[in-house]
UniProtKB/Swiss-Prot annotation:
One annotated Gene Ontology cellular component of this protein: chloroplast
Domain of life: Eukaryota
Gene name as annotated: GLN2
Entry similarity comment: Belongs to the glutamine synthetase family.
InterPro entries: Gln_synt_N, Gln_synt_N_sf, Gln_synth/guanido_kin_cat_dom, Gln_synth_cat_dom, Gln_synth_gly_rich_site, Gln_synth_N_conserv_site, Glutamine_Synthetase
Reactions accelerated catalytically: L-glutamate + NH4(+) + ATP = L-glutamine + ADP + phosphate + H(+)
Protein name stated in the entry: Glutamine synthetase, chloroplastic
Subcellular location: Plastid, Chloroplast
PROSITE patterns per record: GLNA_1, GLNA_ATP, GS_BETA_GRASP, GS_CATALYTIC
Top EC group: ligase
GO molecular-function terms, A-Z: ATP binding; glutamine synthetase activity
PANTHER family per UniProt: GLUTAMINE SYNTHETASE, GLUTAMINE SYNTHETASE, CHLOROPLASTIC_MITOCHONDRIAL
Length: 428
């Protein structure tokens, strides 16, 4: 992730003409190479493979792969929004009369909020406001994915709409002038269906201890690479600012990185990337979880480390600005923790490359701290910081806007600042 915040970011996503290569070719690579853990599992997977050769299935696939562009200007727009739990994704499709390139060209829409836990049955209508457009790698052509946020019919953001508040913070003049960059490291775990046990693990048992799996290569060390690669290509096709992927410390766990992205775009891109991953695992017959500690015991949890910098941090003398930001973050530690994802107390134990949830800490190149500063940043005297506290199920709208608010808009008292500086051995 050190490279993510060193490059110039692409601030605005522009729709370009999609590749002529049919997007369906991408999914031909989604083949699960599961280790033979039990005869029943192997038989189940082989039956699935045989069914895919069925002539009926093939006819359905041929229809899915139809290119409609030669016959109509109409396109399909998939409207995507966050559901009632604050982490679940919902979507539905509509036909548009012609291709569009900007969210302002799209109509608002509505859905039944009583079926998503976001509105009562007697007044169930929730309004979708289109906010960001991405190319659709599943349908190809001029078809699009639309990230939306959610409002009452009167135009008020509903409680689960965290994007609206984030947009307010990022539109603040002081925040806007600092051009905040975010690089987000999304970890996730792939599970075998029906048993909800990590992909590649023997059902009800465990593989060898952690060590060989991080960025590992080989059938005995890497399970789920096809899904990770398919997701990577789908994100690139869609126009998501994805910057890399890797296998994680716990087998069956993977990570992708988004960024550097500016302001509200970071949240839009992460949520769309999550949507693509949900769809790909759906097609592959694999369960996706963002649980921050999917397996108890001596196994790493899943986080969503967030790398952050401002214009002042990236300029000469920026390390002093970073230290002031760390001081502010220390004083609002518990406020950030409460907003950084559910179940995070099971992950932030002080073990497995985490800091204790109850104690704020920072360090250079120390992955056991709340906030890590890279050695390059220390050496150059400018750069970025990494907030290692967010859980894998965090809302990127909340985390990114809270980082900006705490470091750019919130001012502690001089007394509190002095005490925190002394406690953290910070000279600011």
């Amino acid at each position: 992730m050190a490279q993510i915040l060193a490059a110039s970011p692409t601030c605005q996503m522009r729709l370009t003409k999609p590749s002529s290569i049919a997007s369906s070719k991408l999914w031909n690579s989604v083949v699960l190479k599961q280790k033979k853990q039990s005869s029943s599992k192997v038989r189940s997977f082989k039956v699935m493979a045989l069914q895919s050769d069925n002539s009926t299935i093939n006819r359905v696939e041929s229809l899915l792969n139809l290119d409609t562009k030669p016959f109509t200007d109409r396109i399909i727009a998939e409207y995507i929004w966050i559901g009632g739990s604050g982490i679940d994704l919902r979507s539905k499709s509509r036909t548009l009369e012609k291709p569009v390139e900007d969210p302002s060209e799209l109509p608002k829409w509505n859905y039944d909020g009583s079926s998503t836990g976001q509105a009562p049955g007697e007044d169930s209508e929730v309004i979708l406001y289109p906010q960001a457009i991405f190319r659709d790698p599943f349908r190809g052509g001029n078809n699009i994915l639309v990230i939306c946020d959610t409002y009452t019919p009167a135009g008020e953001p509903i409680p689960t709409n965290k994007r609206a508040r984030a947009a307010e913070i990022f539109s603040n003049k002081k925040v806007n002038e600092e051009i905040p960059w975010f690089g987000i490291e999304q970890e996730y775990t792939l599970l075998q269906p029906n048993v909800n046990w990590p992909l590649g693990w023997p059902v009800g048992a465990y593989p060898g201890p952690q060590g060989p799996y991080y960025c590992g290569v080989g059938a005995e060390k890497s399970w789920g690479r096809d899904i990770s690669d398919a997701h990577y290509k789908a994100c690139l096709y869609a126009g998501i600012n994805i910057s890399g992927t890797n296998g994680e410390v716990m087998p069956g766990q993977w990570e992708f990185q988004v960024g550097p992205s500016v302001g509200i775009e970071a949240g839009d891109h992460v949520w769309c990337a999550r949507y693509l991953l949900e769809r790909i695992t759906e097609q592959a017959g694999v369960v996706l979880t963002l649980d921050p500690k999917p397996i108890e015991g001596d196994w790493n949890g899943a986080g969503c480390h967030t790398n952050y910098s401002t214009k002042s941090m990236r300029e000469d003398g920026g390390f002093e600005v970073i230290k002031k930001a760390i001081l502010n973050l220390s004083l609002r530690h518990m406020e950030h923790i409460s907003a950084y994802g559910e179940g995070n107390e099971r992950r932030l134990t002080g073990k497995h490359e985490t800091a204790s949830i109850d104690q704020f800490s920072w360090g250079v190149a120390n992955r056991g701290c709340s906030i890590r500063v890279g050695r390059d940043t220390e050496k150059k005297g400018k750069g970025y910081l990494e907030d290692r506290r967010p859980a894998s199920n965090m809302d990127p709208y909340i985390v990114t806007s809270l980082l900006a608010e705490t470091t750019l808009l919130w001012e502690p008292t001089l007394e509190a600042e002095a005490l925190a500086a002394q406690k953290l051995s910070l000279k600011v």
